[in-house]
Amino acid sequence: MRWLLPLSRTVTLAVVRLRRGICGLGMFYAVRRGRRTGVFLSWSECKAQVDRFPAARFKKFATEDEAWAFVRSSSSPDGSKGQESAHEQKSQAKTSKRPREPLGEGEELPEPGPKHTRQDTEPAAVVSKDTFSYMGESVIVYTDGCCSSNGRKRARAGIGVYWGPGHPLNVGIRLPGRQTNQRAEIHAACKAIMQAKAQNISKLVLYTDSMFTINGITNWVQGWKKNGWRTSTGKDVINKEDFMELDELTQGMDIQWMHIPGHSGFVGNEEADRLAREGAKQSED
């Protein structure tokens, strides 16, 4: 009869774990992509696997079977309920924000869908707040600009803004005006902020691989304005009009400017770059 004891304990444990989810005494946290994948019984355990992990995928379930099905599948299990949180963020970013705990019964965020080409540039209708990814209370967005033959007569520049997989606000368009890489980076950020304001979003975490844009808007612009839009050496600011527009757009916004290495495998940055390159192929209006 001794051999029955381990089996009895195993069965009892399985029943207890199942009851934890059903009775609301606990939930099952499934991590599909993180430092460790699997099913965890507490948010703190789950958070340790996904916090600051690029493109982490995790979701909360009421039953262990559903949780494991999510871990093993490439898309959400049919009929499953929960809320997945997708954080495509730079792992070495210095910020006090942390991924939020999934809120329980709700729809899973979509997996990456077909790649989008140019989006309608008309003002977008207000979209559900649930379609965005968050870092704390701030909405996450990735921007990028590109320019082929930069500095030459045949230069073609585009801007890309990426809000998430299959998001209706994802956009890739041709840069109007002077075709340069730096202008494209600045105006990609401008486009993202304009879109955010149209959605009544006031808090952003904006990822860009352009330190020029970040330094310009967070450090240099105040000195330029004091000097009559001249550099510390007395020269005219080359991208004066572009930074003036960006500076005006940031008023009333709470923006965390985050640098992310370009072409380093971070999904959000790669998608923003793809959109920018598609935009550069378009004709100028």
Curated annotation (Swiss-Prot):
Cofactor(s) listed: Mg(2+)
Cofactor descriptive note: Binds 1 Mg(2+) ion per subunit. May bind a second metal ion at a regulatory site, or after substrate binding.
Sequence positions that bind Mg(2+) 1: D144, E185, D209
Main location per the UniProt record: cytoplasm
Keywords in alphabetical order: Cytoplasm, Endonuclease, Hydrolase, Magnesium, Metal-binding, Nuclease
Catalytic activity reported: Endonucleolytic cleavage to 5'-phosphomonoester
Positions that bind Mg(2+) 2: D144, D273
Example GO BP: mitochondrial DNA replication
All residue ranges annotated as the RNase H type-1 domain in the record: 135-281
Region (Disordered): 72-126
UniProt note on regulation of activity: In the presence of magnesium, manganese is inhibitory.
One GO cellular component term noted in the UniProt record for this chain: nucleus
Uppermost EC category: hydrolase
Record-linked InterPro entries: Ribosomal_bL9/RNase_H1_N (IPR009027), RNase_H (IPR050092), RNase_H1_euk (IPR017067), RNase_H1_N (IPR011320), RNase_H1_N_sf (IPR037056), RNaseH-like_sf (IPR012337), RNaseH_domain (IPR002156), RNaseH_sf (IPR036397)
The protein's role, per its UniProt record: Endonuclease that specifically degrades the RNA of RNA-DNA hybrids. Plays a role in RNA polymerase II (RNAp II) transcription termination by degrading R-loop RNA-DNA hybrid formation at G-rich pause sites located downstream of the poly(A) site and behind the elongating RNAp II.
Family: Belongs to the RNase H family.
UniProt cross-references to PANTHER family, sorted A to Z: RIBONUCLEASE H1 (PTHR10642:SF26)
Record text on subunit structure and interactions: Monomer.
Record protein name field: Ribonuclease H1
